[in-house]
Amino acid sequence: LLEEGLKAIFPEQKIGLSAEISKQRNKIAVKLITKVVGDDGIEVEAEGIDAFGGALTTIKSLLLRVSLIMRSELRPLLILDESFPAVDSSRVHLLVDFLKVLCKKLDMDILCITHDPAIAEGADLGYKIRPTTQGAKFDLISNPRK
């Protein structure tokens, strides 16, 4: 799942990611190893969620959350609250496509909170929330793609 996600969003780059998930003292521990092969063919390896920074860190965080919720006994629900600020606008459509594939393959739902119209347009169902004097008003967007 981790490598498939990275390849879907960064198809032109050679990126590998492995995760060792274990339980230590009643807490989940994750060791992430990221490998990137540069244009010169040199492989660089780093440990940690923030290895190589920016959009790569954002996507690794998403994939890690998905991996963890798939271990749950409940129907998986992934909540994403403005989770992709570092993802370049040229990659947002790839990200949305990948999220749809995840939902189908893993039989899960995603609740995505965003101000990014490109992400909102990819939704199957959308709501616009606006403040009123009586509190928040939820307006159903029947077809977010329009």
Stretch-by-stretch model annotation:
Residues 2, 55-58, 62, 91, ...:
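Helical mechanochemical/support elements of P-loop NTPase systems and associated helical scaffolds
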Residues 6, 62, 113:
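Conserved RecA-like P-loop NTPase ATPase core
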Residues 81-83:
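Walker B catalytic acidic pair
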Residues 36, 53-78:
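GG-anchored amphipathic helix commonly corresponding to the ABC/SMC/Rad50 NBD signature/C-loop
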Residues 1-51:
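Extended helical coiled-coil dimerization/tether regions that scaffold
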Residues 94-146:
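C-terminal lobe/lid and adjacent interdomain/linker elements of RecA-like ASCE P-loop ATPase modules
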Residues 74-75, 85-98:
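Conserved D-loop/post-Walker B switch-helix segment of ABC ATPase nucleotide-binding domains
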